[in-house]
């Protein structure tokens, strides 16, 4: 086994001032939200303005900060330059779709075309996340945040979210190319995309504008100077398996990733004879140690940050601020200063 010589913290991410988009994700239940909120807090200390966005339908950042957020950015209590928002997964979905049961008065060709168009839009994987993503990016583009942190949904949803710019770029390009053949349907397309009742030419112009924005976003997501993905896992088989799958998919999509957080690690206490006091803790520690060794072998070119399992949950700005220091100060069980990080 090769020893991981890279710094075991997220300091490299915090120091990379060119980053605009930072995704934090992994398997469900590994502590993604705590990690993403902690990262946003650390970034707020060195960047002009930081926005953290929840794309997880569970919307845990409200619980993490003990403050209610909604679909517009709100200042996080206790911070001058940290903002948060939670987007709804069903934005722009059912209400804007055509009712397939309604008879068309414009003839069979137009009716058939509408059904085909609806199937094209409705058949996109993760259409609810896609519409949410589209509206969210329009909002963010109109603002001036220095860096944006995404607290993402579990792996499958996140991969669809990241595929959306490429997918929609291809779809919009094809729709624009079909303008001459399907001009009567362009107005219908405008309604589906929330562009309002506008003419076919206006719809095409709006689609071109949207396509330009999507192309810029797609390009930025594939630029390692602007975008990176921080993977969060725990030292168990299923989580490690899903992390490897996630990293392979990110690599396939040309999205940079070089940081892994291993969360909820157990550091059992020993008695005066050097024996672990709790047998179950000792067994769990042995399992985690095995997977930590595998992580060190598999990801020797990654910065691997190890975070402890605490006795109580991390909730509220104060506890999150204290916990966030673990991202830049490697955890040391024997250090008295570490114990102070969890105090109010």
UniProtKB/Swiss-Prot annotation:
Signal peptide position in this chain? none
UniProt cross-references to SUPFAM superfamilies, sorted A to Z: P-loop containing nucleoside triphosphate hydrolases
Q: Which GO terms describe its biological process?
A: detoxification of arsenic-containing substance; positive regulation of insulin secretion; tail-anchored membrane protein insertion into ER membrane
Q: Where is the active site?
A: 56
How would you summarize the oligomeric state and partners of this protein?
A: Homodimer.
The job of this chain, per UniProt, is described as: ATPase required for the post-translational delivery of tail-anchored (TA) proteins to the endoplasmic reticulum. Recognizes and selectively binds the transmembrane domain of TA proteins in the cytosol. This complex then targets to the endoplasmic reticulum by membrane-bound receptors, where the tail-anchored protein is released for insertion. This process is regulated by ATP binding and hydrolysis. ATP binding drives the homodimer towards the closed dimer state, facilitating recognition of newly synthesized TA membrane proteins. ATP hydrolysis is required for insertion.
What protein name is recorded for this chain?
ATPase ASNA1 homolog
**What organism does this protein naturally occur in?**
Brugia malayi (Filarial nematode worm)
């Amino acid at each position: 086994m090769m020893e991981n010589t890279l710094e075991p913290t997220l300091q490299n991410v915090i120091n990379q001032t060119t980053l605009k988009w930072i995704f934090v994700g992994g398997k469900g239940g590994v502590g993604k939200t705590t990690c993403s909120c902690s990262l946003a807090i650390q970034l707020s200390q060195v960047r002009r303005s930081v926005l953290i966005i929840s794309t997880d339908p569970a919307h845990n950042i409200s619980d993490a900060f003990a403050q209610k957020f909604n679909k517009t950015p709100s200042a996080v209590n206790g911070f001058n330059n940290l903002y948060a928002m939670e987007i709804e997964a069903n934005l722009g979905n059912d209400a804007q779709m055509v009712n397939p049961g309604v008879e068309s008065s414009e003839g069979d060709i137009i009716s058939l075309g509408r059904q085909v168009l609806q199937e094209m839009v409705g058949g996109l994987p993760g259409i609810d996340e896609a519409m949410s993503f589209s509206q969210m990016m329009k909002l963010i583009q109109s603002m001036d945040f220095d860096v944006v942190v995404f607290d993402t949904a579990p792996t499958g949803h996140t991969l669809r979210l990241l595929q959306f710019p490429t997918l929609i770029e291809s779809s919009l390009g094809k729709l624009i190319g079909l303008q001459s053949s399907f001009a009567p349907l362009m107005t219908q397309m405008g309604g589906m995309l929330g562009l309002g009742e506008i003419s076919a030419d206006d719809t095409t112009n709006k689609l071109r504008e949207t396509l330009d924005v999507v192309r810029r976003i797609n390009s930025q997501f594939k630029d390692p100077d602007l975008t990176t993905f921080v993977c969060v896992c725990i030292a168990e088989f299923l989580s490690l398996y899903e992390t490897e799958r996630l990293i392979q998919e990110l690599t396939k999509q040309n999205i940079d990733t070089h940081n892994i957080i291993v969360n909820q690690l157990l550091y059992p206490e020993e008695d005066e004879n050097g024996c672990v006091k709790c047998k179950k803790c000792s067994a769990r520690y042995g399992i985690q140690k095995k997977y930590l060794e595998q992580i060190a072998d598999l990801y020797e070119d990654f910065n691997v940050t190890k975070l402890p399992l605490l006795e109580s949950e991390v909730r509220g700005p104060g506890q999150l601020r204290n916990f966030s220091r673990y991202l830049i100060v490697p955890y040391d069980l024997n250090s008295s200063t570490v114990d102070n990080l969890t105090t109010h």
